[in-house]
Amino acid sequence: MSTSGATSALARSGENGAAGPSGSGREPSTGTAPSDIAGPARRRTGQSRRRRGSLSADLIVTESLRLLDAGGLAGFSLPKLGRALGADPTAVYRHFASKDDLTLAIADRLIEEAMTGLEPGPCWQETLEQLIRRIRLTYRRHPAAASLASYRTTQGPAEMRAVNVLIGAVLQAGYQGAEAARVYRALGDFSLSWAGGEAHLLALEPELQQADRSAWRGAYLSADRATYPNIWQVRDDLPDVTEDAIFETILSVVIEGVVRQAPRPCTCPRHARKDG
């Protein structure tokens, strides 16, 4: 789980004198998150200058996520974060060694939100599906933050818990050793890559999102039959394909692949009846 350029917004955040170290045309989903997933970042009231030592790493991450939700990547910088916290921007470095450390903490907060309320059950297929869906919904709820840090390996407590749950489901399926590690990495990378890709699209300015969405009713809808015969056959259906439908289709393909190769089929009542 790695990426390059994920900290570009923070790399520019030393502007204004702050000190310290340095898509595919799809419409936003109408799906809603499970009720047991934590909602948006908590808001802090009062912007007066804070007393030295009154800041905490948790508060800094919460306020960072609020700023990213409200103003996107363009609305997030260390000077703005300092003003929102009522503190000097350099105070951040008493809690985070670098901007990248803050980025990783934000990424771990997103995973924490996705994991809230998730309790693995006897059905390993459902555990895999729920975790992957939760990551996607959380990233869609916080697209700017997700696009900043979606592919990072945080090594934080939330990520460690998510990895433990995911590997546990893979072990339940009968995979062992190197094969279990490979299947886990494939599922984890699929989840973060897909959710991160959607987040990058949703983090764009609304007019750019609209320009991408309109392509399916523009160039593709009017594709020349002789030049693009395959596009022409499905041109009327392409604009109606939703984000949710695309995701659920690829998720089912991925999970079915894991099921087909699993040494130990799921024995929960739902899948036992289906397999029988």
Question: Language model features by range: what are they?
Answer:
Residues M1-K80, A84, A97-L104:
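Basic, helix-initiating cap at the start of DNA-binding domains
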Residues A162-F190, W194-R217, P239, V258-A262:
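Hydrophobic alpha-helical bundle segments that form small-molecule/ligand-binding pockets
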Residues D69, I111, M115, R136-R140, ...:
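Short amphipathic alpha-helical interface segments enriched in basic and hydrophobic/aromatic residues
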Residues G86-F96:
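Short hydrophobic/aromatic patch on the recognition helix
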Residues T116-R161, G177-A180, Y184:
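Hydrophobic alpha-helical connector segments
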Residues M1-R44, H200-G276:
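C-terminal peripheral helix-coil segments that are non-catalytic and often amphipathic
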Residues L59-R66, A70, D101-G117, E126-R134, ...:
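Alpha-helical structural segments
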